[in-house]
Amino acid sequence: MATMHDKITLQLPAKPEYVSLGRLSLSGIASRAGFSYEAIEDLKIAVSEAITNSVKHAFKGEEDGEITVEYLIYEDKLEVRVSDNGTSFDLETRKQEIGPYDVGEDAEMMRIGGLGLFLIETLMDDVKLYYDEGVSVVMTKYINEKQVEENAKSIST
């Protein structure tokens, strides 16, 4: 198991104007951790989607909501937890309501709803959802995933 080096916590009001603050802080943290430009862009999109989902769905425009964003930096990965204490939902029920997405489907013809979680799952290496008091989305991205694959190929037995 990888050792955690640092944990950074950010408390955001559940308002659209603060989504960019989560994205900007992530960019600096991921850059310092050694992620490539492409991986940082993927991380920024995924975290923006997770925070936006909390703003739009957990609090439904209420002024007093708060979102917690935790960045856990390990030697080989970055784990980002976006948590709220707003209205929860059941992912499996939601997936059944909207049906599966076809990656070959024309983007203009895609139905609205559920695309944020689809994007998060596509861009991140691992995604877990927890339903306690609200929803927590835990997203993991490994550092130098291509390098890890190359090293595995070069190991001889």
Curated annotation (Swiss-Prot):
Cell inner membrane listed as a keyword:
no
Query: So which domain of life are we looking at?
Result: Bacteria
Q: What class of enzyme is it?
A: transferase
> Which keywords does the record carry?
ATP-binding, Kinase, Nucleotide-binding, Serine/threonine-protein kinase, Transferase
Q: Which reaction does it catalyse?
A: L-seryl-[protein] + ATP = O-phospho-L-seryl-[protein] + ADP + H(+); L-threonyl-[protein] + ATP = O-phospho-L-threonyl-[protein] + ADP + H(+)
**One GO biological process from the UniProt record?**
negative regulation of DNA-templated transcription
Give the SUPFAM superfamilies listed for this entry: ATPase domain of HSP90 chaperone/DNA topoisomerase II/histidine kinase
GO MF entries? ATP binding; protein serine kinase activity; protein serine/threonine kinase activity; sigma factor antagonist activity
Entry's EC annotation:
2.7.11.1
InterPro entries, from UniProt? Anti-sigma-factor_SerPK (IPR050267), HATPase_C_sf (IPR036890), RsbW (IPR010193)
Effect of changing residue 102 to E: reported as: In strain: 689426 and LO4035
The keyword Lyase belongs to this UniProt entry's keyword annotation: no
What NCBIfam families does the entry give?
Answer: PRK04069.1, rsbW_low_gc
Please give the function described in this protein's UniProt entry: Negative regulator of sigma-B activity. Phosphorylates and inactivates its specific antagonist protein, RsbV. Upon phosphorylation of RsbV, RsbW is released and binds to sigma-B, thereby blocking its ability to form an RNA polymerase holoenzyme (E-sigma-B).
Q: What PANTHER family does this protein map onto? A: ANTI-SIGMA-F FACTOR RSBW-RELATED, SERINE-PROTEIN KINASE RSBW
Please state which protein family the record places this protein in.
Belongs to the anti-sigma-factor family.
- What is the official name of this protein in its record? Serine-protein kinase RsbW
What is the scientific name of the source organism? Listeria monocytogenes serovar 1/2a (strain ATCC BAA-679 / EGD-e)
Lineage of producing organism: Bacteria, Bacillati, Bacillota, Bacilli, Bacillales
